[in-house]
Design a protein with these regions (language model features):
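Loop/turn-to-beta-strand initiation segments
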Residues: 222-224
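Short beta-strand segments
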Residues: 226-228
Length: 234
């Protein structure tokens, strides 16, 4: 999300220009867009696409392995870092979702194997760690959307984190089911609608999108307005 990758162009100004960025397909596409917004269109850093169980060597002594986890954005990974001093496991942001919207599940097999090997230090995401129980699956949100769309008689306005592509896909699917057009309001959201389909992370039915300026041309019960603004998104 923006709170993780938004500072990369600023950091890149201060480090060696032969630095390599490793990330998932969507992550790298979003980072490239950040550089373009920053005014850097040439001499971009080398970006290498990784997937679950991809391994890279860092210097002589460090080996980093990417392990698939589920989160509120696609292409999220934990890092298994092997060093001469020990094994460090960095979870990254994660949410254990057994029925994810994109069907790309946590790589429990590899996590179990790494646990059996032994971990000397785990640095873990702690969001909601003080709350007992399990977080509901994202699919349950889709059910809630369908219930609300069924009841709605006027326009529907949905605020969403721009890079939460799973949630956006659920809104698209529900709008299509109820034969509503979608208007997008928010620069960061428009950018995601440009990027995510190009890397296979959004499936948008033909003719479902309309410009925000065209909303008045449709009846209220024919439109969904998708907007952003959370955490300062433009």
């Amino acid at each position: 999300h923006e709170d993780h990758i938004g500072g990369i162009p600023y950091l890149y100004e201060k480090i060696e220009k032969d630095t390599v960025i490793y990330g998932g397909k969507l992550t790298n596409a979003l980072i490239k867009s950040k550089f373009e917004n920053f005014g850097v269109k040439k001499n971009l850093p080398k970006m290498v696409e990784v997937g679950s169980r991809s391994k890279i060597s860092v210097g002589k002594y460090f080996t980093v392995e990417f392990v698939k986890v589920t989160h509120s954005i696609a292409d999220s990974y934990s890092l298994s870092i092997k060093t001469p001093a020990g094994h460090v496991f960095v979870t990254g942001d994660f949410k254990i979702d057994l029925t994810p919207v994109d069907n790309e599940k946590v790589d429990f097999v590899r996590l179990s194997e790494l646990g059996e090997e032994g971990v000397d230090l785990m640095l873990s995401d702690s969001t909601n760690s003080e709350v007992e129980g399990f977080t509901p699956s994202e699919r349950s949100v889709g059910d809630a959307f369908r219930q609300e769309f069924q009841k709605a008689t006027g326009r529907i306005v949905v605020a969403v984190f721009a890079s939460h592509v799973h949630r956006i896909q659920q809104i698209i699917d529900t709008a299509a089911q109820f034969k509503r057009k979608i208007a997008i309001d928010g620069r960061s959201l428009l950018k995601v609608f440009e990027i995510a389909p190009s890397v296979g992370r959004l499936n948008i039915p033909k003719n479902i999108l309309i410009p925000i300026s065209a909303v008045e041309q449709f009846q209220d019960d024919e439109v969904v307005i998708l907007c952003t603004g959370t955490q300062g998104e433009p």
